[in-house]
Regions:
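Conserved short histidine dyad/triad with adjacent acidic residue
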Residues: 70-86
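Short acidic-glycine-tyrosine-enriched beta hairpin
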Residues: 106-121
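Glycine- and acidic-residue-biased ligand/ion/polar-headgroup-sensing regions
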Residues: 89-90, 94-100
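Ligand-binding loop in jelly-roll beta-barrel domains
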Residues: 121-148
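A short, N-terminal "cap"/entry segment at the start of jelly-roll beta-barrel domains
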Residues: 17, 22-66, 152-178
């Protein structure tokens, strides 16, 4: 267990103790105490698209259940995701620093610090962000949390399916994508 994990455990224990006494601790978490995560969930060679994407799941650290909040860094040349759209979950991003290119279908829009973009659930417009600059980009991504979700990837032979919280990537022929 590393030092950051120990601090996180101590903070969580204190929070749980206060809640058990009917008290609410100050809802404060420092992002420096949260381990970052890489996005490597895609099957096969598709993982390469998001090399250079890292997130800090601040919403998880705050025990939020209705929506996720991630502080994301995107290295030059990296994408936040494959081109996709959600059937049941809204998405929102706000750029904190640097710049990324929002790709929606074949249209590109540059987003810089302070710019926001939102993606309504059920609208079949494929989208993703790419850092085409030479500097790191930092953004917040916020999205609905559903136990059941389908994410479509136009131009790719699989979909993301979440049923009762269990995630599977399924090919168009019905087999599991690996």
């Amino acid at each position: 267990m590393n030092f950051e994990c120990i601090i996180n455990h101590i903070e969580r224990t204190a929070l749980d103790f206060n809640r058990s006494k009917g008290e609410r601790a100050v809802p404060k978490v420092n992002e420096l105490n949260i381990a970052s995560q890489k996005r490597d969930r895609y099957p096969g060679n598709h993982k390469k698209v998001t090399e250079g994407y890292e997130r800090i799941a601040v919403g998880d650290a705050m025990e939020l259940t209705q929506f996720g909040v991630n502080k994301v860094t995107v290295a030059p040349g990296a994408s936040t995701a494959l081109n996709h759209w959600h059937e049941n979950e809204d998405e929102f991003v706000i750029i904190l620093s640097g710049e990324v290119v929002l790709v929606e279908n074949n249209n590109e829009t540059t987003l810089r610090a302070g710019d926001c973009a939102g993606f309504k659930a059920g609208e079949p417009v494929g989208h993703h962000l790419i850092n085409k600059s030479s500097e790191m980009a930092v953004l917040f991504e916020v999205g609905t949390r559903r136990d059941n979700e389908v994410v479509n990837y136009p131009g790719v032979d699989f979909t993301y399916r979440k049923v009762n919280g269990i995630v599977t990537f399924v090919k168009k022929d019905g087999s599991v994508a690996t």
